[in-house]
Amino acid sequence: MPVVDVDPDELRYLTGHSEKDDDELKSDLFNLGLEFEGWTEDDEFQLEFAPDRLDRLSVEGVARSLRYHYGDDRGVEIPNTNSADWTIEVEDQPDERPYVTGAIVRGLDMDEAALESLIQLQEKLHATMGRKRAKGAIGVHDLTMLKGDSVTDETGKSITYTSADPDEATFVPLDADAEMTPSEVMASHETGQTYGDLVADFDRVPAIYDAIGLFSFPPVINGRRTEVSVDSRDLFIEMTGTNQWTIDHMCNIVCYALAARGGQVEKVDVSYADDAPGEYAGKTLERPDFSVRTKTVTHDRIESILGVSLDSREVVDYAERAGLDATETESDDGVAYDVEVPPYRVDVIHPLDIIDDIGRALGFNSLEPTYPDVSTVGGRHERSRLEDAARDALVGLGFEDLLNFHMTNEVENFERMNLSTPEAEDGNDADTVGLADPVTIQEPYSEDYTILRTWALPSIMMVLENNTHRSYPQDLAEIGLAAGLDDSENTGVAEHRTVAAALARTDASYEDAKARLQALADAFDKDLETPPTTHPSFIGGRAAEVVLDGESVGVIGEIHPKVLVEHDLELPVAAFEFRLDALA
């Protein structure tokens, strides 16, 4: 869970509620879902909160939530923006990091507390949305130290996001006194050593230039020339990454935080060259993008989830107190609400998120629990007992137990496993393990999580990929959820628990995996047969069906070299996967 350090005096200042003592603030924060974890050495609150509320990674974001809670603010608030007449020209940027966004914020009251909060927000966003800067990285610069390439009335000022030769480009990085090349930064600068691996394999590294020269080497480090201090009043914000949506929303969160400090947000144009990689080639984007999103939720569903009766005026009122705007409308299911979501709320992806906000505005403490009329006696489900027994057996066979995400994406689930996606219909057998039609996420929060996995072996392969620096052998197993579309099910989705295991070692073979599988079958008194089969993820002639008590339930074999190469594995891997219920 994310933890943010917040000065209670700053909360009182930013909310305008100087009368609130520390205990009152803690109670109010708890009602918002922020739990007090303790004090820092600087007498600040340590607050833990749900990882989806990334807009609360700063004291400004926490204060905004409190102002809504107190009723001082209502509904969606959009900062007033002007055009800054600045353009980010995007040309010859690295294909591996093709996207950029930005904004200008003027007139800030930048004291020490504000600067510390900005730095904390920057690093927290790097660690969360930015995936340790791999997916998105933020650069904040003193605007007065930049010089645009053009100062004509027609075109305004511009800077350039491009690529540079890591051994030729030079600049003075932060915390340094002499010019260095990007290669030297990655080799000898402390920050460069930490984040240089993100671009070390690039032929040309990301670089941002103004008329003076290189001033940012994203995602590694900024230049000293544009360093921000407490004397800075006007800031230029740039963000680069592998996904435009991610960096745009990171930018929104930062801009809202700075606007809370009195900053005036100004828009910049992001102009992509005609030959730029990605879907924005030849396009000019106006950023930051403060467009609101609209979600629809029905009145019946709100009452059903919260367990209370509300009239329409109350729903609209609670939505506004949660920082949303709700308009009553009609749907096929009766009264509904079109709810506008502010641009910093990246967590709202489903009507249930709206209902959760309404419930918090109502006050979950005000909800009265009701007891069921029927008395029941609880007990463990047989499936749970079976799962624990299978897990104990796998551990006894020398496997390390894993717990992976059930959500993944089509590239990991299919392509990197040498499987074509089901819609490709290129001859893959419909009964191939892992080849079910996937359950897709309608509005995915991240491109990494767009489907429910159809099998667990790809998850294990990703763990092996991320642990090539560890010693071998690595024998890993997981019992977890897999799912696929199935019209015969009432929900249209068939879910099952699956058992997957892999042996990564110098002598890994089909025979090794078969011996472990046989021992597992014997432990559950199951008759095991392994007739030969073919599967794209396994080597031809070294794969077989897993047949337990006469029913085909899985596959076993040696992983195909293509799959090993995709996962940067240099040792052979033998693996199996089958349905857990076959052990019942």
Swiss-Prot record:
Catalytic reaction annotation: tRNA(Phe) + L-phenylalanine + ATP = L-phenylalanyl-tRNA(Phe) + AMP + diphosphate + H(+)
E.C. number, please? 6.1.1.20
Mind telling me which InterPro entries this protein's record contains? Answer: aa-tRNA-synth_II/BPL/LPL, B3/B4_tRNA-bd, DNA-bd_dom_put_sf, Phe-tRNA-ligase_IIc_bsu, Phe-tRNA-synth_IIc_bsu_arc_euk, Phe-tRNA_synthase-like_B3/B4, Phe_tRNA_ligase_beta2_arc, PheRS_beta_core
Q: Name one GO biological process term.
A: phenylalanyl-tRNA aminoacylation
Q: Which cofactor does it need?
A: Mg(2+)
Gene Ontology molecular function? ATP binding; magnesium ion binding; phenylalanine-tRNA ligase activity; RNA binding
Subunit details: Tetramer of two alpha and two beta subunits.
> Which Gene3D superfamilies does the UniProt entry name for this protein?
3.30.56.10, Bira Bifunctional Protein, Domain 2, Phenylalanyl-trna Synthetase, Chain B, domain 3
* All copies of domain B5, residue ranges: 290-369
| Signal peptide range in chain numbering | none
Q: Which domain of life is it from?
A: Archaea
Name of the protein in its database record: Phenylalanine--tRNA ligase beta subunit
Q: Which HAMAP family match?
A: Phe_tRNA_synth_beta2
Which top-level enzyme class is recorded in the Swiss-Prot or TrEMBL entry?
Answer: ligase
Example of a GO cellular component annotation carried by this entry: phenylalanine-tRNA ligase complex
Residues holding Mg(2+): D347, D353, D356, D357
Mainly resides where?
cytoplasm
